[in-house]
């Protein structure tokens, strides 16, 4: 009797593990694909520039033998961009399919994708170096594109934005605008990057709070 019960428990546990493995398989395969693309892509970039693989796989401070805090504020800004993007995309996933929450889900999706792109831009200096120098796209044209996208974002989602603590968004805009003005007309990294960092902090704070607010509004009792 005890042996039979043990076999049943073992079979049940095994079935549970196999079921979890099957459920995790699609995301696991995606993880393998992304990881492989990152590893191979980094090596291809190094090879294309005639550099050792270490230049694209190790930390910049280790490669340049610099202090650990080199780029500290910039790195923190990139972390905030990506954290804000992750928060928004999770919120969009939670609201997907919720009746009447389509506009909120779209707002969070757009906010997340925009934040993700800005984080990648900031981290890899896309608008500063890569696109102007390698693709011939003027930096001012990229600024104009970003401003146009932000304008469209504000107009299209204005109803949703007014349901959130939008003064935080205004503060983010002031910080970013001040950084752009200082970059174009003055020569002060302290003030340019300082106001930009404030803008990123307020942008992230706004989106963290907006995600929480909208999810609670659209899913009562959560």
Residues of each region from the PLM?
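Polytopic alpha-helical membrane-helix bundles and their juxtamembrane interface segments
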Residues: 3-222
């Amino acid at each position: 009797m005890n042996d039979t019960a043990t076999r049943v428990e073992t079979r049940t546990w095994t079935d549970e593990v196999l079921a979890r493995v099957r459920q995790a398989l699609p995301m696991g395969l995606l993880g393998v694909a992304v990881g492989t693309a990152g590893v191979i892509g980094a090596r291809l970039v190094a090879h294309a520039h005639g550099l050792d693989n270490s230049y694209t796989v190790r930390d910049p401070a280790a490669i340049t033998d610099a202090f650990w805090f080199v780029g500290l504020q910039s790195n923190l800004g990139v972390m905030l961009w990506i954290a804000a993007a992750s928060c928004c995309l999770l919120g969009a996933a939670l609201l997907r399919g919720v009746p009447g929450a389509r506009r909120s889900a779209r707002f969070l999706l757009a906010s997340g994708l925009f934040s993700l792109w800005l984080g990648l831009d900031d981290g890899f200096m896309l608008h500063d170096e890569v696109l102007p120098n390698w693709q011939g796209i003027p930096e001012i044209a990229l600024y104009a594109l970003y401003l146009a996208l932000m304008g469209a974002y504000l107009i299209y989602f204005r109803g949703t934005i007014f349901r959130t603590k939008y003064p935080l968004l205004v503060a983010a805009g002031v910080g970013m605008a001040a950084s752009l003005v200082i970059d174009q007309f003055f020569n002060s990294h302290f003030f340019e990057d300082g106001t930009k960092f404030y803008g990123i902090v307020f942008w992230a704070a706004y989106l963290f709070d907006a995600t929480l607010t909208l999810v609670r509004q659209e899913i009562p009792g959560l």
